[in-house]
Design a protein with these regions (language model features):
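Residue-level detector of flexible, active-site-proximal loop/helix-junction positions
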Residues: 119, 196-198, 256
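A short, acidic, amphipathic alpha-helical segment used as a generic capping/interface helix at domain edges
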Residues: 34-38, 95-101, 210-223, 234
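Electropositive, gly/pro-rich neighborhoods at or near active sites that engage anionic ligands
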Residues: 2-185
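Hydrophobic residues at beta-strand termini and immediately following loops
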Residues: 52, 192, 252
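C-terminal functional extensions of proteins
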Residues: 237-302
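Glycine-rich phosphate-binding "P-loop"
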Residues: 125-130, 190-214
Length: 302
C-alpha cells in the first residue's frame, strides 16, 4: 500500500528497490520499458508465448512448500491461499499438487515479470530459457508504446471474473485512455467468466483443479489469437494452457481490469493509476461481486 507521506513513500520505494537489487544480483532483468517492448514484439510475431508473473500469495505458499517438504502448511498460508487466491480445498495433498503445477508453469514462461515475492527467487533458479523483466512491463498504460497496441486486429480472449463490465467498457474503449493507444480495436473480443473462489466463495466445484479444467475447456472452445488472463491463482496455469495450445498469452492478473477502465479500491489513491481515472471509468457491475469481498484485501478489486 502506498504511504500517505511522500517522503516516507520515497524512502520505502528506495529500500524496496535496494533489497530487490541485492537479492536478484546476477539475474539479467530487463527494465520495464524494454520488457514492454519485448512483449509487443512477441505479439507482433504471432508466435505462441507466455508472459506472466508469480502471485504473491502463491509464492508464499510455495515458500512453505519448499521449507516443509510439501506438508505442514501454516494456518495463515492455508487461509491466505483460500481467501486471497481462491485455491481449495487447502489440505496438504491439494496444496502440494498446486505448488508443483505453479512452479512448473512459472519456470516454463518465455517472459516473467519479477517483483520479489515469497519464494520467487528460488523458483526462477529452475528457469532454463525464460527472460526476466520488471513488474510494470506487464501494465501497458505505463509505457509510451504500450504492448497492448499490438492487440489491434487480433482475436482477443479475456479470462476474468468481471465479464459483463469488461464487455461494456470495451465498447467505450476510445474514452478510456484518450490520446494513448492502450486499448485498440480488436478483430473480436471473447470474455470467459473466471471462477471466483476468493474470500471463501463457494464455486460449485469440488476442487480448484476441477474449476481449472472447466475453464481450460471453455478456452479450447473459443476462437482467439491472444489470451489476457486475470483469474486469481488460475491466471498463470490458464495463460500457460493458452500458450501450450498455440496462442499468445499475457497474464495481467489483477491489473487486467485496468486495461478496460474498471476502477478498484486498491488503485483509488495510486499516484499513477488514479490519474488515469476519468468519467468513462466504472466500478465492477454489482452482479460481479462476491459475498465476502472484504476478505480480499479489504475489497481491493471493487
Amino acid at each position: 500500500m502506498d504511504n500517505d507521506n511522500p517522503l516516507l513513500q520515497k524512502a520505502a520505494d528506495f529500500y524496496r528497490g535496494l533489497r530487490f537489487t541485492m537479492k536478484y544480483r546476477g539475474v539479467d532483468i530487463l527494465p520495464a520499458a524494454a520488457g514492454n517492448d519485448l512483449a509487443r514484439d512477441l505479439l507482433e510475431s504471432g508466435q505462441p508465448f507466455l508472459f506472466g508473473r508469480c502471485g504473491a500469495t502463491e509464492m508464499r505458499t510455495v515458500a512453505d512448500w519448499l521449507q516443509n517438504g510439501g506438508h505442514n502448511f501454516t494456518d495463515r498460508t492455508r487461509a491466505d491461499i483460500r481467501n486471497l487466491s481462491g485455491v481449495f480445498p487447502t489440505d496438504d495433498a491439494t496444496l502440494d499438487k498446486f505448488c508443483r503445477l505453479y512452479v512448473k508453469t512459472a519456470q516454463s514462461a518465455e517472459l516473467l515479470a519479477l517483483w520479489n515475492v515469497g519464494a520467487e527467487r528460488e523458483v526462477i533458479r529452475g528457469c532454463d530459457a525464460t527472460r526476466f523483466t520488471e513488474l510494470r512491463a506487464l501494465e501497458p498504460y505505463y509505457h509510451a508504446r504500450p504492448w497492448s497496441a499490438a492487440l489491434a486486429g487480433k482475436r482477443v480472449l479475456v479470462v476474468h471474473p468481471f465479464r459483463r463490465t469488461i464487455l461494456a467498457q470495451y465498447e467505450k474503449r476510445t474514452q478510456l485512455f484518450p490520446g494513448k493507444n492502450v486499448l485498440p480495436e480488436f478483430a473480436s473480443l471473447t470474455v470467459i467468466q473466471a471462477v471466483q473462489g476468493l474470500g471463501g466463495q463457494d464455486t460449485g466445484y469440488a476442487s480448484w483443479f476441477d474449476a481449472l479444467t472447466e475453464m481450460e475447456r471453455r478456452m479450447d472452445a473459443a476462437d482467439y489469437d491472444v489470451a489476457i488472463v486475470g483469474a486469481g491463482a488460475y491466471s498463470l496455469p490458464l495463460a500457460a494452457h493458452a500458450r501450450d495450445t498455440g496462442h499468445a498469452a499475457i497474464q495481467m492478473s489483477g491489473a487486467t481490469q485496468l486495461l478496460f477502465g474498471i476502477k478498484g479500491k486498491r488503485w483509488d489513491d495510486h499516484p499513477v493509476i488514479s490519474k488515469l481515472y476519468n468519467p468513462a471509468w466504472v466500478r465492477p457491475d454489482e452482479t460481479e461481486g462476491i459475498s465476502n469481498k472484504e476478505k480480499v484485501e479489504g475489497g481491493s478489486y471493487w
